[in-house]
A protein has these predicted regions:
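Paired acidic/hydrophobic, glycine-rich loop segments that form the ligand-binding mouth/hinge
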Residues: 92-95, 314-318
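Extracytoplasmic/periplasmic substrate-recognition and gating elements
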Residues: 194, 267-271, 289-291, 315-322, ...
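C-terminal capping/gating helix-and-loop segments adjacent to ligand/active sites or protein-protein/ligand interfaces
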Residues: 43, 386-396, 402, 406-463, ...
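Short helix-initiation/N-cap motifs at beta->coil->alpha
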Residues: 71-80, 203-208, 295-309
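Conserved N-terminal structural module of periplasmic/extracytoplasmic solute-binding proteins
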Residues: 2-109, 113-130, 136, 198, ...
Length: 467
């Protein structure tokens, strides 16, 4: 992150010459600072190998720090994490989804202005000498975070809190390595057969292509689907797709304090028969409405990802993390990846990512935050990204991935990717959005359905200014 990160050190004068990597003859301060420390990172998706190069680099200057990564299955991770933190057996550093911030602020030690720790320094030209120096290092500021990362990271990772003297302060509670975005996977053979030369760039073209690509039998059962969307039970991340449509349609998802506003008519939206959030919901559910020309999907279809993998649906809105799943399950499938369709206004995409944060109960908070900053610097982050084949979160690395066949589409979307605050109970908020889809499909008035969903989401909200 931060190319100038190491230039921000404020060096103290406590230096001890070492024998090898030991601390013989060191001052009490050096001896205490270089006592062996173990940092444990908890997360999902990655193995220890993904961080191996970064850990090796960090230990060159901090040989007294051992770093290990523990991988969990996605379905078990949050429960294990919450229980471990409550029982004081949790990790020093853990991965936190960008939508979890509201529910985790009381479990996090925010990034302090300065971290204090010892670093091994090698000096001399002919006779090399090793010495530990105690450093008081300035940490990343909100301005530096804003400069290095997309705007959505600042909205998610910076929390306004009250200090003991009653003033407000902005604090960083996490830093990402990668940002994923929704994109359009498309089956080349099926689009070719339908005479469609390129994937749709707008939702209007998407509708037209869906009509061309959908095939039914004599009993009107769907034999080939144009796209796997319209419902929620068998569409992975249906609430993200709906949120993307809402935001592209001009919906303001929340106010400045995080309270839901997607049921409202935004200022300056002109004469509309329906609020944009309700319009977007109708647009989405039309694909699963048998009375509509764009009908292409229903709850009897398989999971949308499975349908795409088996060639039964032509288009699938998904994330980069699903790419290796598709490649592994269907190595002969001819498919492409295109940017998410747009609604005609300013480009907007949907962000889905994880932040690395430090537990309030860690006994090595300064070292833990120093490692998080080191890991998310552009020099080190690129090693993780190359090992995992994930899209970057850093502005400085976007161009490096822009022409990559697998990552280019996703990397090019991160600067326009947005998300929205879902309070302290993300599961409850997402269930409210899923039920919104079901209610409209069941025939409820769209405005009534979005009103109900907004009221339910509001019950999960902790005001951002008081977290």
């Amino acid at each position: 992150m931060f190319r100038g990160y190491r230039k921000a050190f404020v060096f103290l004068t406590l230096v001890a010459t070492l024998t090898g990597l030991g601390c013989k003859g060191a001052s009490p301060e050096i001896a205490a600072a270089t006592k062996q420390k173990s940092l444990q990172i908890w997360g999902i998706f990655d193995d220890q190998d993904a961080y191996a190069s970064i850990i090796t680099d960090y230990r060159l200057a901090h040989p007294y720090v051992n770093v290990t990564f523990r991988k969990f299955r996605p379905e078990e991770y949050e429960k294990e994490l919450v229980n471990a933190l409550a029982e004081d057996r949790g990790p020093d550093i853990f991965m936190m989804h960008n939508t979890w911030v509201g529910g985790y602020t009381n479990k996090i030690s925010p990034l302090p202005p300065v971290v204090n720790l010892a670093e091994l320094v090698i000096s001399g030209t002919i006779k090399k000498e090793q010495a530990y120096e105690l450093h008081a290092k300035n940490t990343v500021s909100v301005r530096q975070l804003q400069s290095a990362f997309p705007d959505q990271v600042v909205r998610d990772a910076v929390v306004t809190s009250r200090t003991q003297d009653g003033k407000t302060a902005q604090q960083i509670v996490g830093i990402p390595l990668s940002i994923d975005t929704l994109a359009l996977y498309w089956n080349r053979d099926l689009l070719n057969a339908a005479g469609i030369s390129e994937p749709p760039a707008t939702w209007g073209d998407f509708q037209k292509d869906v009509i061309k690509l959908t095939k039914t039998d004599a009993q009107m059962y769907i034999v080939q689907s144009g796209a796997g969307l319209g419902s929620e039970k068998n569409v992975p991340r249906a609430t993200d797709i709906l949120s993307l449509l809402m935001m592209q349609n001009g919906t303001v998802m929340t106010d400045d304090n995080g309270n839901p506003t997607f049921e409202q008519m935004p200022p300056g939206s002109g004469d509309r028969a329906m609020v944009p959030g309700a319009q977007a919901t109708v647009f989405y559910t039309d694909f699963a409405n048998p009375n509509k020309e764009v009908y292409t999907w229903n709850d009897k279809q398989p999971n949308a990802l499975d349908a795409f993998v088996t060639g039964k649906t032509a288009m699938f809105l998904g994330y980069q993390y699903q790419l290796p799943i598709i490649q592994a399950r269907a190595p002969k499938l001819k498919f492409g990846i295109a940017s998410a369709p747009q609604a005609g206004g300013p480009e907007k995409n949907f962000a889905n990512y994880w932040l690395y944060t430090v537990s309030k109960k860690s006994k090595s908070q300064d070292v833990a935050w120093d490692f998080v900053q080191f890991m998310t610097s552009d020099k080190e982050a690129v090693k993780y990204l190359e090992a995992t084949k994930k899209p970057t979160a850093l502005r400085s690395l976007i161009q490096d991935q822009a022409e990559d066949l697998d990552l280019g589409v996703f990397a090019n979307q991160i600067l326009t990717a947005e998300s929205w605050y879902r309070g302290a109970d993300v599961a409850a908020a997402e269930q409210a959005m899923n039920d919104l889809i079901d209610d409209v499909l069941a025939g409820d008035k769209p405005q009534d359905a979005v009103n109900t969903a907004s009221q339910r989401v509001a019950q999960t909200i902790l005001p951002k200014s008081n977290q």
